[in-house]
Amino acid sequence: MGLNYEYCMPVTILGIESSCDETSAAVLIDGQIVANYIANQSIHEQYGGVVPELASRAHQANIVPVVDFALKTAGISLQQIDAVAFTQGPGLLGSLMVGAGYAKGIALALNIPLITVHHMQAHILAHFIEDPKPDFPFLCLTVSGGHTQIVRVDSHLEMEIIGKTNDDAAGEAFDKCAKMLGLPYPGGPLIDKTAANGNPNAFTFAEPKIPGLDFSFSGFKTSVLYFLQDRLKQ
């Protein structure tokens, strides 16, 4: 079923995201964000990382109030939605299933289109929500907790990964190094904030020698571990 553009009526889309440890819902009217609400999961802090089973259970508890709040903020009812979009992956399977199931239920109940969204493509296409919009073709560096990629973007749906991490993602390396330092989860933002006022030349760590456009962060993570072990001996 296609979207109804008859009489150039505004198109209202409900977006649902549940790929990891945040439950999010947004409402877009004619491409403009009119509501965006995110529920975090603090339960993972005590474990120093995301526990998939706990994440999916938290999504189940959060999905209804998060969507309701987004609709209320937008000043519309569920019946005014023209289509519903959801993250189909990549991500944590249990978490993805919660968002997918809820989105499919809405689409079936209202007989409206269901739009599947690729998580990493969405990171790139988010640049088109606000102005100025990029011109094709362009290169995009995507850096997150689970992915680090260089992507050639030829159109909205034509993308080619030309460089990627061979092991850990940059965000994952940040969080694991933060855990070594005894920082609470998620520690990556804390390291980033602290480093902003630090001395970048105070210590030297091994730099990966990877051919081409790929990345590697596991060696850096190991270098930090050995550095901390040596410092503790002193």
Residue ranges of model-derived segments:
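Conserved phosphate-binding catalytic cores of ATP/NTP-utilizing and phosphoryl-transfer enzymes
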Residues: P10, V117-F138
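A short helix-loop
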Residues: P10-V11, S18-S19, N36, D135, ...
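Nucleotide and nucleotide-moiety/phosphate-recognizing core
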Residues: Q80, Y102-H119
